[in-house]
């Protein structure tokens, strides 16, 4: 752990040093430094907008008859028909519209990593995740008939449960209750869509089975959540990491 912390410290110091040097480097050129300028403004030695005047009679800026700025008939600024400023059909001005295009949304890597560690996030279920497949537990229901019924039909019951992260619940009972409800609902809807219905006995047995599976899922997720918090506390309490954080704060403030 100590060696890893020292390597992290060296990496961040090198990165921030390079960023600091880049910020101090003067940028070449800039506004009003000569060369090409905004259209219609002169410059000491650079390119200019096409010279004013010089056209024939009725040509204010060098275009043909009825061409105010050098375009064709009905072209106000040099574009084609229906092109206000030189772009194609429905384009308002070449690269200007490209600058205003919204940037693509960035994927939140933190959320992706969390979903991969905890389970697959199910779309359309409001943040529920689908746990890993489990072996269906061997259970007894108080009478031989239900025990036999379960053994003969256990493959019709779910072997995965839907759940939310454990930190969204106050206790195990709330987690298990929510887990049982959403799992049975999703399984019955999916199975009914395939043309198979469940009896009251199926629902009764399924509730017991899924409850046991949700309890197992809670214990697994609680242990992983506790281990993750403990590892984070140990990492951020080590002297090299404290020194690294202090150095980064100093660079940002300075």
UniProtKB/Swiss-Prot annotation:
One of its GO terms (cellular component) is dendrite. Sequence repeats lie at residues 51-59, 60-67, 68-75, 76-83, 84-91. Disulfide bonds join 179-214. Residues 232-254 form a propeptide. Cu(2+) 4 binds at residues 85-87. Residues 23-38 are annotated as: Interaction with ADGRG6. Belongs to the prion family. This is Major prion protein. It comes from Mesocricetus auratus.
């Amino acid at each position: 752990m100590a060696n890893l912390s020292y390597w992290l410290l060296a990496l961040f110091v090198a990165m921030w040093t390079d960023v600091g040097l880049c910020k101090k480097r003067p940028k070449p050129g800039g506004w009003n430094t000569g060369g090409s300028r905004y259209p219609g403004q002169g410059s000491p030695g650079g390119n200019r907008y096409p010279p004013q005047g010089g056209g024939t009679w009725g040509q204010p800026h060098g275009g043909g008859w009825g061409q105010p700025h050098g375009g064709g008939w009905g072209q106000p600024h040099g574009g084609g028909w229906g092109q206000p400023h030189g772009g194609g059909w429905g384009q308002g001005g070449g690269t200007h519209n490209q600058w205003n295009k919204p940037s693509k949304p960035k994927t939140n890597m933190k959320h992706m990593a969390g979903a991969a560690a905890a389970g697959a996030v199910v779309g359309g279920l409001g943040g529920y995740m689908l746990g890993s497949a489990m072996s269906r537990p061997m259970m007894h229901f108080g009478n031989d008939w239900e025990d036999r019924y379960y053994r003969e039909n256990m493959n019709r019951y779910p072997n995965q449960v839907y759940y939310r992260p454990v930190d969204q619940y106050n206790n195990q009972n709330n987690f298990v209750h929510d887990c049982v409800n959403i799992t049975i609902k999703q399984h019955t809807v999916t199975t009914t869509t395939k043309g198979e219905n469940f009896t009251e006995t199926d629902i009764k047995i399924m509730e017991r089975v899924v409850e046991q599976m949700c309890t197992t899922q809670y214990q697994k997720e609680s242990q992983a959540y506790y281990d993750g918090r403990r590892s984070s506390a140990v990492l951020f309490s080590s002297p090299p990491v404290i020194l690294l954080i202090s150095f980064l704060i100093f660079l940002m403030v300075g």
